[in-house]
């Protein structure tokens, strides 16, 4: 339907960029949803278990992921390049948190391998959150393209 509209209406470059950006965003938003569903499934499977460690950094990652997705979508809706840039910059914090979680879990497994199953589940949650952050960055990259006509991969 979008492609037909493009052919019939023959939009100017700015309109075409906005429509093509929206089509690109759909893929990232869908992947964010898939990863959120995967996290929910893991958490559901762990709900009756005693956790091997406090998930302080993972909780921070979750909050950061929500903020990045929200701000990424808001940057597109409002054509806000500054918000897109701020959101892209937050990915460094997300990556650092993931590295911290990964290192903590590796050490936990080294100390007691009986914790490995749950540690792997926690690692998967952290990786999904990190990927959600990456998809939020993609949304921002496409927002900047929509506004400027230049696509820069961060």
Give the location of each predicted region:
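Cytosolic, long alpha-helical scaffolding segments
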Residues: 1-154
């Amino acid at each position: 339907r979008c492609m037909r509209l493009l052919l019939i209406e023959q939009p100017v470059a700015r309109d075409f960029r906005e429509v093509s950006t929206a089509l690109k965003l759909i893929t990232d938003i869908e992947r964010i949803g898939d990863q959120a569903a995967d996290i929910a499934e893991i958490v559901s499977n762990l709900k009756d278990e005693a956790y091997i460690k406090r998930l302080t950094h993972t909780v921070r990652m979750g909050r950061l992921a929500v903020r990045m997705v929200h701000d990424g979508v808001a940057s597109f809706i409002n054509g806000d390049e500054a918000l897109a840039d701020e959101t892209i910059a937050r990915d460094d914090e997300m990556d650092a948190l993931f590295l911290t979680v990964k290192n903590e879990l590796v050490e936990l497994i080294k100390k007691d391998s009986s914790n490995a199953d749950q540690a792997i589940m926690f690692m998967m949650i952290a990786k999904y959150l990190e990927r959600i952050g990456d998809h939020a960055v993609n949304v921002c990259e496409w927002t900047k393209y929509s506004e400027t006509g230049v696509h820069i991969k961060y």
